[in-house]
Structure formats: C-alpha cells, structure tokens
Amino acid sequence: MAGTTPVAFDPAPLHLGLVMTFTATTKVLAGQIVSHHATGVSRAVIPATNATAGALGVALHTAEAGELVSVAMNGSVVKIMLSTDDGTADAGDWIGVSTVAGCGVVRDAAIHAHEATAGLGNAIGIALDDIAAGASTVGGTGYILISISPPWTAVS
C-alpha cells in the first residue's frame, strides 16, 4: 500500500468540548491531530506524529505557519483520519498518533500490559465509529471522542 498523504478535511464536530487557539509553527491541515511544538514554544502546535510531544487535539481549520489555529480538545467529538498503513478501527478502540503527520492509529490493547515498544506517545481518544480503510493514499475518517491520556511507555 502506498504511504498516506495527509489532506485537509472537515473534522465536522458533533460536539465541541474545550477549544483553544494556538499558533501553527508549520502548516496545519484541517482535521489533523496536533501536538505541542517540540521546542516548547508557548501555545504553538505542529501536526502530531508518534515522535512529537504530547497530542493536544484536532485542528478545526487549516492554518499556514505563523497563523492561529483553533484546536478541538478534551470532550470534543470530531472526525480524524487514520493512516492508510494502519487500516481500520472499531468503535471502542483507543486511537493514538501515527508515524504519519496528523493521522491516527489504533492503539494495541497489549499496551495496557506494558508492551515494550518505544515511541508510543499519547492516545488522542476513543473511536466512536467503526472506521473503514481509506483508498490509495488517503486514510479512512471517523468520529472519536477526544480524551487525551498520558504517554504510554514500557515498564521494565
């Protein structure tokens, strides 16, 4: 399967919980999962990957670098996009952040049993829908309840 190409899409909020405005330090697309800027710049976000700082929420609109972007946070119900490499999700699955900027991935239930995989990052929330696979380079989209959890890490 070809790699995912992040695209802007309407996150179509069903419910907005906490919403805050941040500065995009690089281009952020509508619907992308965003995280703190890695350098610790105050109130600044970038598209999240499993290698960035903790996930904050989902961008409600596209913003160029230096522009303000509204971010749906805890308690919000919005659509996210899964990475095409990560396939599908079932309602009730925990969704984390993929290696693809701004995309989600199903969190393996074994993580709760202290899986020894590094770079697991935050869970962004819980899938409310079964999310079908996308087509070609665009992942499937579906609703999640944003419920940020702390980073899951391996325990020795």
At which residue positions do the language-model features occur?
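Glycine-anchored, exposed beta-strand/edge motif detector
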Residues: A2-S156
